Amino acid sequence: MYEWLNALPKAELHLHLEGSLEPELLFALAERNKIALPWNDVEALRSAYAFNNLQEFLDLYYQGADVLRSEQDFYDLTWAYLQRCKSQNVIHTEPFFDPQTHTDRGIPFEVVLNGINQALKDGREQLGISSGLILSFLRHLSEEEAQKTLDQALPFRDAFIAVGLDSSEKGHPPSKFQRVFDRARSEGFEAVAHAGEEGPPEYIWEALDLLKIKRIDHGVRAIEDERLMQRIIDEQIPLTVCPLSNTKLCVFDHMSQHNILDMLERGVKVTVNSDDPAYFGGYVTENFHALHTHLGMTEDQARRLAQNSLDARLV
């Protein structure tokens, strides 16, 4: 079944480029940039990938991102991910990047963007993988800082297809960023947002009504609100669900408890994605395979999930 799932044409719509930084590349970039790491070797770093919640993961995620310094570093990060896409027949990807993770460390916005964009361009030309980049604001930072990031992005307007919202969800509702998203949409950006992962269904309502998003990233807690579920079904609003991430971060205690197939059968436009694959133990195919192994996902369900991902593209 793994080989069949791997060969299935699919799109990935929920992937953080910084979260695809594999330990081997992290160590190579640390050596290139002469950065001392708190782990002795790759295996020690892998063993640190034991999280009890989103915040514990994010602490390690931001620490790992510190090795990314130059355009070449961001190119290498993105190119490694695209090669993985090619090996798993991901024919289209819409990755996130978090400029504030890097600009707050003194890395110029254009250094980050140039490295990523050159890799995406090469991916289109050399690998045949179409793509669109999403600029994501960090919700644990202030609205003012998000506005500054949008200011930095506007000269490069054509480099992005959308703005997004990620990082620590609890205590940071979408409404905090309503004015930023209003402005981004007035500049021609589409909008997506993480909502309903650790946060309540109310955050999904806010993302839909205040941020006016086209896609819900995660959204698994929508199932707790019947009226919300009906709206998502009626309007066919896509959900970019990340099964391995959800179990690794204890959104669900075990994959056998995941609700993605329940939502699929109710008519929700759910998709399968890897989120931060270097940290969560699998890329898109591994996420599909986990659904087959633990939930008995059928070939028909897999085809529908893959088709949903292709249908839910912004570009």
Curated annotation (Swiss-Prot):
Active site, UniProt feature: E197
Disulfide bonds: none
Cofactor binding notes: Binds 1 zinc ion per subunit.
Cofactor(s), by name: Zn(2+)
CDD domains: ADA
Keyword annotations of the record: Hydrolase, Metal-binding, Nucleotide metabolism, Zinc
Family: Belongs to the metallo-dependent hydrolases superfamily. Adenosine and AMP deaminases family. Adenine deaminase type 2 subfamily.
Keyword Nucleotidyltransferase: no
Binding sites annotated in the UniProt record for Zn(2+): H14, H16, H194, D275
Catalytic activities: adenine + H2O + H(+) = hypoxanthine + NH4(+)
Described purpose of this protein according to its UniProt entry: Catalyzes the hydrolytic deamination of adenine to hypoxanthine. Plays an important role in the purine salvage pathway and in nitrogen catabolism.
GO cellular component: a single term: cytosol
Tagged with keyword 4Fe-4S: no
Enzyme class: hydrolase
Entry's EC annotation: 3.5.4.2
GO biological process: adenine catabolic process; hypoxanthine salvage; nucleotide metabolic process
InterPro entries named among the record's database cross-references: A_deaminase_dom, ADE, Ado/ade_deaminase, Metal_Hydrolase
Sites annotated Important for catalytic activity: H218
Pfam annotation, one family: A_deaminase
Binding-site positions, substrate: D276
Protein name: Adenine deaminase
One MF annotation (Gene Ontology) recorded for this entry: zinc ion binding
